[in-house]
Regions:
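PLP-dependent aminotransferase class I/II
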Residues: 72-76, 84-87, 148, 152, ...
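PLP-dependent aminotransferase-like
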Residues: 102-191, 198
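Conserved active-site segment immediately N-terminal to the catalytic lysine
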Residues: 189-222, 238, 263-268
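Short beta-strand-to-turn element immediately C-terminal to the catalytic PLP-Schiff-base lysine
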Residues: 213-214, 227-232, 285
Length: 422
């Protein structure tokens, strides 16, 4: 009986191989075929030109490596870009979120609602303040946090919402702002993916109570590391300045004692050393000059991917949000498991064998052991969990050539068709 079963399976496998040959399919590299690419391509990469290098060299030759004029220059440039009244730059995107949570008044026992499909910092910033993250599910087509799920999660302990502009497409800021006003909550927009994006004609960074940016190398513009918090609220702005620099001030209006002299300063809050260096700021100022080019190229690549993958029934393309003119940070491709003979992990590995190195953004935050120990369990956000099981992040960055883009499309198509469920 066992031998008969094995013979049957061998026969089926042989027929499938013959069918693929008849259809002219190329064998995937993981099955012994030839890789689409000779060299590896990764999901993200910074773009640094001679102007960026010169900007950094100029600072290195100057008197101010930190706490110098480039900080104010960068903050002014961010305000001009977004229309926000105030910008406070800092050491990284996580620091920006922590500062924003502190400025929002998050403390022990407070709840803050966020999405599980994000980097851990979006929730960790709440824990830093002694609060508790509450996870709300995502829209199954846009993958952004669902405003109705946010409102359903509000309790008397809710203090704020951290809404992530996932992949660079804006969250529904009108609806989220309405919900937050109705319930007296602070809206913190985690805009790590969204610099250069507009929502209904207004720049992200000028709409929410606070918006945070990240300038990690895989982001659209980079300072090596770096972050920023933008706001239109002067009170929040002054708090952010304190939290960035140890809670120390030289402003007489903020001091409790009379100044002894020009050297005098006071610590009036418990803050941190979250300062950005002038070296980072100079690089970012130069990078921001290229933001329109970066945005346009990313949009071109996304459009080409969408055109290619929308035709394949075993793949699902993320829904475009028409109100969001986006600087796309990530390209998320989703497999349709019932139409394939392989799962996401196998698809991922097959692409790697073609020298197309993808990633997965993100593991739901509450899956991590640290969060499990805090009492979070799987099943909280079904849409987010299903997305995680099916998604891949494809290469997307400014320096990709047309040939790079077409090689990614060829590799994905090759694998999707070869392993199509018949």
């Amino acid at each position: 009986m066992h031998e008969k079963c094995m013979s049957f399976l061998t026969l089926v496998a042989g027929r499938r191989t013959e069918e693929r040959k008849i259809r002219g399919m190329k064998k995937p590299a993981i099955e012994g075929g030839t890789p689409v690419r000779e060299t590896k391509i990764y999901y993200g990469h910074q773009y640094i030109d001679d102007a960026d290098i010169q900007a950094v060299v100029d600072v290195l030759k100057s008197d101010n490596l930190t706490c110098g004029p480039k900080i104010g220059e960068l903050e002014e440039k961010l305000c001009q870009l977004t229309g926000a009244r105030y910008a406070v730059v800092c050491s990284n995107g996580t620091a920006a979120l922590h500062m924003a949570a502190m400025a929002a008044g998050v403390g022990a026992g407070d709840e803050v609602i966020t999405t599980p499909i994000t980097f851990a910092a979006s929730a960790n910033c709440v824990l830093y303040c002694g609060g508790r993250p509450v996870f709300a599910d995502i829209d199954p087509e846009t993958y952004n946090i669902d405003p109705e799920k946010v409102e359903a999660a509000i309790t008397e302990r809710t203090k704020a919402v951290v809404a992530v502009d996932y992949t660079g497409q804006s969250v529904e800021l009108d609806r989220l702002s309405e919900i937050c006003r109705k319930h007296g909550l602070v809206l913190i927009e985690d805009g790590a993916h969204v610099i250069g994006t507009t929502y209904k004609g207004r720049a992200n960074g000028s709409i929410s109570d606070m918006t945070t940016f990240s300038f990690h190398p895989v982001k659209t513009v980079t300072g090596g590391e770096g972050g920023a918090v933008l706001t239109n609220d002067e009170t929040l702005y002054k708090k952010l300045l304190l939290y960035r620099a140890h809670g120390i001030t030289r402003e007489e209006a903020q001091m409790e004692h009379e100044a002894d002299g020009a050297w005098y300063y006071e610590q009036v809050e418990l803050g941190y050393n979250y300062r950005m260096t002038d070296i980072q700021a100079a690089l970012l100022i130069s990078q921001l000059d290229k933001l329109p080019l970066f945005k346009q190229r990313r949009k071109e690549i996304v459009a080409r991917y969408n055109e290619a993958f929308d035709r394949l029934p075993m793949l699902f393309v993320q829904k475009e949000i028409p109100e969001s003119d986006t600087t796309r940070h990530l390209y998320i491709l989703r497999i349709v498991p019932e139409r394939l003979t392989i799962d996401r992990k196998q698809f991922f590995e097959a692409l790697a064998a073609e020298n197309v190195c993808c990633n997965v953004h993100y593991i739901p935050t509450y899956y991590f052991p640290y969060y499990e120990k805090q009492g979070y369990k799987k099943g909280l956000c079904p849409n987010a969990e299903k997305l995680y099981e099916e998604m891949l992040s494809l290469p997307l960055y400014y320096a990709m050539t047309d040939a790079d883009v077409e090689s990614v499309i060829e590799a994905v198509t090759k694998i999707a068709l070869y392993y199509e469920q018949k």
